[in-house]
Regions:
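Conserved alpha/beta-domain cores
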Residues: 1-206, 212-214, 226-228
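Divalent-metal-activated hydrolytic enzyme cores
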Residues: 217-218
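Short C-terminal tail/terminal secondary-structure segment
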Residues: 221, 226-231
Length: 231
């Protein structure tokens, strides 16, 4: 991808973010934009960084590690947003600053145990808000117990929720439901040292406007910025 094309895509995306924020009286500077770069090259990520995208989301561990090696000179915030295999938690804990796809106490515990000394890992709980059997994520009825038990784990900060809606779910309905759950769960953070509950990660290229208007403060965009995967 040419740098000029990426910069143009980013400019248009920022305009859409600004408009969505204006509609709900939200400050656009409160929105974290994560560039999702699965199948994109390290050179494309470097272009994105130079254009101002400093948070990068990756779905596949080995692909991400290769890119990280090529981009050590950049101060990138790396987010793991894919499905987590138990045998990969050590490498995820060692190499990423954020993990968006925690859906069990077992995974949270492994990430906590395997996080390097002196490092704090930011975790988001993936919520299956529409109860889609084909999607990963914890059911809303189980999330309070998971968060409460995870408060005893060292080396992590529980920052909030990550949402991926099912294809058939109306984003207006799905995201508003998720936002209500997020706000309700904020009460859990009182008196808990490692619960911060300040991050609602929801919204992708096709529906990030609705997500922002429903309360998201972190969006994960790939196609809008980089075009079809691998280009």
């Amino acid at each position: 991808m040419k740098a000029a094309e990426l910069e143009s895509n980013l400019s248009e995306t920022k305009k859409a973010i600004d408009l969505s924020c204006k509609l709900v009286a939200k400050d656009p500077s409160t929105i974290r934009l994560i560039g999702v770069t699965k199948t994109q090259s390290a050179d494309t990520i470097r272009q994105a960084y130079n254009a101002g995208i400093t948070d990068i989301g990756e779905n596949y561990l080995q692909e991400a590690l290769t890119k990280m090696d090529a981009l050590r000179d950049l101060d990138i915030g790396w987010h793991f947003i894919g499905s987590i295999q138990s045998n990969k938690t050590r490498l995820i804990a060692e190499n990423f600053e954020w993990v968006h796809s925690v859906d069990s106490l077992k995974l949270a515990t492994r990430l906590s145990d395997q996080c390097p000394k002196g490092k704090t890992l930011n975790l988001l709980i993936q919520l299956n808000v529409d109860k889609d059997p084909n999607k990963r994520g914890i059911d809303v009825s189980e999330i309070e117990e998971l968060v409460s038990k995870a408060t005893d784990l060292p080396n992590i900060k529980i920052r909030g929720l990550m949402i991926i809606l099912a294809e058939q779910t109306d984003p207006v309905v799905g995201y508003k439901t998720a936002s209500k759950i997020f706000e309700k769960l904020k009460t859990l953070k009182s008196n808990q040292e490692n619960i911060y509950w300040d991050t609602l990660s929801m919204g992708m290229s096709k529906d990030f406007e609705q997500a922002i208007q429903s309360g998201s403060n972190t969006i994960r965009l790939g196609t809008n910025l980089f075009g079809p995967r691998g280009n």
